[in-house]
Structure formats: C-alpha cells, structure tokens
Amino acid sequence: MFERNQKTIFVLDHTRYFSIASEEYISMDFLKGKPSAHSSAGGSSQFSKSLWTCACESSIEYCRVVWDLFPGKKHVRFIVSDTAAHIVNTWSASTQNMSHVMNAMVMVGVPSRSMPQSSDYSVIHGLRAAIEALAEPTDEQSQAMASGIPDDLILNEGRVICITSARDNTSMKSLEDIFNTVLIQQNVLSATPPKKGLGINHCHLVILNIVPLGIDSMVTNRNLLEISPLLDVEIHTVGAPDISYKLTHLILDHYDLASTTVTNIPMKEEQNANSSANYDVEILHSRRAHSITCGPDFSLPTSIKQGATYETVTLKWCTPRGCGSADLQPCLGQFLVTPVDVTSRPSSCLINFLLNGRSVLLEMPRKTGSKATSHMLSARGGEIFIHSLCITRSCMDEAPSIADGPGGRVNDYRTSELGQLMKMSRMVPLKSRDPAAPNLPRRLPRYFPLTTTSTVLFHLQRHLSWLPHFLHLLVKEMDKQDEVRCQQHIHELYKSASRGDVLPFTHTNGARLKPHKAKDQYRLLYRELEQLIQLNASTVHHKNLLESLQTLRAAYGDAPSKSEAGTVNLRSFTESPLSPERLEAMSNVSISSSTNSNSLLKASKRRMSNCGTRSLLDIISSAERSQSNKRLDFSGRICTPIGQIAKLYPDFGNKEKDAAAAAAASGVGVAPKE
C-alpha cells in the first residue's frame, strides 16, 4: 500500500562551500555571427554556475519528473541546512508543486561567500529534520489511521537524498553513524507515549558528494550497503555539472522508470524556415511500456547519451497520424510521459505537436532486419501518454493451426480420439463422496500416441475386429473369461505371424512403414501390446495376460531383454515404438542380413526402452558399432587371447616352412629331421 518511494526528502547543504563556482563555463554571446576577438580573449561573455545552483536545479528537476509521472501519488520534500534546518515544503498537497518550491528556493538564495567558517554550519541539522519529516504522516497515511488501521500495520518507509560535500571517507562515516543514531532515537520516541509521529520501518539514504569540475575527491563511491535493519546507505561522488545526469540515473531505479529517445524528428530550422533537420528528444516513462511489448523476435536498441551513465532505448519517428479511434492499434497499456529536458526547443515542439491532437508512431527493429510499430505517443486531457502496441500475436487473432508445428506440417493427428479421451476424462463436481473415486485415475488411459503413423496398435483397431474390445478391457476391470478371451486373440495373432500373413494396413501415409518386413511389423505390434498391458497391469488378470504375452514372445524367439523388462520410461505415455529413433533402428533390421536380424532387433529394443537417456555420444558410438559389425575383424584379434599381444606375420622368417614351400613348388620332397 505504502511503498518506499512514496516519501522522498532532499537535504541540500547551504554552507559557504556551495557558493564557489562549478568551473563549467557557459557562453553568453547571443549575437549572430562569430564572437568578437575581445570577448573570446577576455572571457567576459562567460559565466559559471555555483555548486548551490547546480544542486537546486537538478533536485527540482528530479521532483518535476516525479510529479509529472505520479501526480498526487508520490511526495517530495526539500530541507535546506546551514546553521539550522529550513523546511521548504510539507507533505500537504498544497505545497507539493513546482511553483511553491521554486518561490521558496528564490527566498533562500545562494550561500554568501562572506559567511563565517563555523561548525554551526552543517548538513547534520538537515538530516535530523529529514528523519523527523519521515515520521510525519502523509495525507494517505492519516486517512488510513483515521479509518481504524493500527499504526503498526501502516508501512512507513522513505528515501533521503543528501547533496553535500565531504573531505574524506571518515567524514562520510560520521554522517552515516549520526544518521543511524538519530533514526533509532526517533523510533523510540514514536513508540513511547505520547507518540511523536509514525515509526520508521526502513530508510534509504543516498549521499551525493559533489565537487567542482576537475577537482579530485578523496571520497570513494560505494554501492548500496546495509548499515542496520533500518538503514541502507549508498555514496556517489560526482562533478557539479554532471549531477543532473546522476539524479536522472538514480530516478530510473527509484521509481522503476525507463528512458526512451525519439530519433529523427523532422523540425523546421529556426533561422531558415525552408529547411528542416532531424532532432532527438529523450522522454521518461514507466519501464513496463517496454517490457510488455517486447517478444522473443524483438530486441531493444539501446545507446548511452554523451555525459550520461544510463542506457536509453532508441525508437524512430514515423509519419504522424490523426488520433482517431479507427487509427489506433491493439494497445497493451498506456503510461504517462515527461521529457528529460523540458526547456529545450525540440522537447517543446514535440509537446506542442502532441497537445494539438496529433499522434506519433514509433518504430523498433526486429531481429530479422525489418521494423515494427511498437509504441505511440498521444495526448489526452493535457497529459501525454506512451501507448505500448501489440506487435506479437494477440488474443483477438486466430490461434495457429496445430498442424503448423515445428518440424514441418503434421496432418495425421488423432483428433477425434483425443476428443473422446477429453470427454471421458472430464471432471464433474459431486454432492456426495463417491466410494469408487480412488480407482478412477487407474482407469484413465496411460498410453496415447498423438499421431496415427507413430503407432501400429491403434492404427489397426479399425481393421481387426477383436482389437477395440481388447483395448477396452485393458483399462477396465477384467475377469477370468476376459483374460482367456484376450489370450486367445494373442495366440491367433502369433499364428497369423507364423503363417506369414500381412497386417491389414490400408495406408502408410508417406510410406513410413514400407521398409519393414511382415515379421518386423508383428514384432512392433507385440512390443506395443506389451507396453500397453504393462502400463495398465493393475489386477491379477492383467498381470497374467502380461506373463502369457512375454512367454509367447520367448517361445517364438522374440524374448524381451533385461532392460526391456524394467520399468517403462515416462516418455512412453505419449510415444510408441514407431517414434523417429525407433524407426531408424527398425530400418536397420530390414536392411541387414537375416543372420544378424535377431541381435540388431534386440539392440533396437534396448534403444527403445532407454531412448529418454541417450546422449549424443551414445548415438555416435552405436552408429560406429553398427558400421564395424558389417566387416570381419583381423584374425590376430580373433585368435589371440585377451591380455596377450598378437604377433605380426608369425610365419615370416621360418626356414623349414620356406624350404617346404619351395620344394612343394618344384616337386621335390624334403625329409624331416629326426
């Protein structure tokens, strides 16, 4: 309800040091043409802002952005510290505006250089007042307290941004310790009666140590650090001319904002009305304007502006259109917009262009190289919004066809069977408890191939009269008669395989089953039958049927391997033995000779049962083994026992054998030695 960024307090150091110049000189030569030699040499037409002016301008610009994007929701206060703390505004809505703050800052004025150097001038007075201001409730918190919500349940967090200048890290450490001590004391005062304000749940202290341009500081930067459960502190050292960039960078994180630069804005030249030039305008808005638009096909073009340390998204200006309802595209969200440099001529021209009722479309590039209109700028009721347009498929578009999936067009899905399965599996609320409810999940199908060409069993159920009844019994309760009838059907199937009958396939849809022989088709059918029964073996009759099928496979020389007899892989719920990896193994069976068909078939079955755990190394190794099995190994490896070294050319150099071979060639016998 109450976020940390609801309360922000600026503590500005108003000591003598802030009266010195920032050493960034601005030219005052407004005459046309080249500057005179006297002005260039003497430098009389240049001036430099003081550290106080840089701090005031950047902090007021910070609160302008907050009040533009969150009108009436986020609160910013200012406290000026010298010999005492001077309160510039309060949490009241009447003082939360630019005119009140700027008039008060004019009355404060720049610190005087004749101010005495005394220990009474310190930023600590402002830090104490900031903690007291955090304990004061805002209008929203006061309403919550009036509605009866306990004070402990009202979250009170805030952020303090202190702009000062310290000598070294020791001075910064003392500021942290003093702030933490005062914070704890304030919570003690808020907890004890009479209560003085709300307790502070957490505070985020940001210390900006600013120095003139070209001066090295002995204070080191430090990221966010938790000092205590109540306090987080971060320190930034920055040059006075760059403090506005630093605060713009910080506000992006403080309020979850994003920066967008509209590029290539055509604008008439001020000095020559007949020509035009392209300008850029940077705007700030909620980060969600980009996050809800981008999809996987889009990338945000980002860049870093000169002098800044944060990224800005670059979007290109498109041809302006009317702001009618017919021209609007599907919109995902709209967010308020404010320019970064509100006083520049390009920003004022863009704002006036939008306030006159025109709209601007913005483009972003795709990964493919083309562009898409992703955002639109328009104004309503005197406020400018950025609209995030839908550049991907929206909910109003028709859903893509299930056939147009990855890997090509698939047109053999079992759509009607899937519809029947969904109707059978629908859930209906019951008034009373059903005693058979625990057994219902067991009766649901656990094996459902998605396509017709990935299964043999369900492909044949329209052509074998007994198969639909067989499949129905597998998922239902089975008695002894059903078990005997199913065993008879399995025996008839094996007899048909022994006779060499071909399975009644009406079509193969792309000749996916052509490489298989009739025997291999039956083996695929047996394997799928066993897999289906094994997944639904919940009763004694199902288990008896599974044992009889395995016994028949062993009797016909098609016994399952050890790995096949293990647990069924989870992928088998939606796959069949005709999945791509298994088809490759079956193709090798039909191509190889009949002598090696048994071993290759068993190897393919092992691959079928373990397909879910195969790696790329396993696939390459199995392919190399299948190639090496096609040729005989060397005789030395075959005849030599394991662990011994085979002798190369064992008959080479044997004189008796050489003489016998020569005599045999000449027809003369050689008597053996006694």
From Swiss-Prot:
Phosphorylated. Pfam families: Mat89Bb. The keyword Cytoplasm applies. The keyword Coiled coil applies. Signal peptide: none annotated. Its main location: nucleus. Residues 516-538 form a coiled coil. It is found in: Nucleus; Cytoplasm; Cytoplasm, Perinuclear region. One of its GO terms (biological process) is snRNA 3'-end processing. PANTHER family: INTEGRATOR COMPLEX SUBUNIT 13, SARCOMA ANTIGEN NY-SAR-95-RELATED. Belongs to the Integrator subunit 13 family. Component of the integrator complex, a multiprotein complex that terminates RNA polymerase II (Pol II) transcription in the promoter-proximal region of genes. The integrator complex provides a quality checkpoint during transcription elongation by driving premature transcription termination of transcripts that are unfavorably configured for transcriptional elongation: the complex terminates transcription by (1) catalyzing dephosphorylation of the C-terminal domain (CTD) of Pol II subunit Polr2A/Rbp1 and Spt5, and (2) degrading the exiting nascent RNA transcript via endonuclease activity. This is Protein asunder.
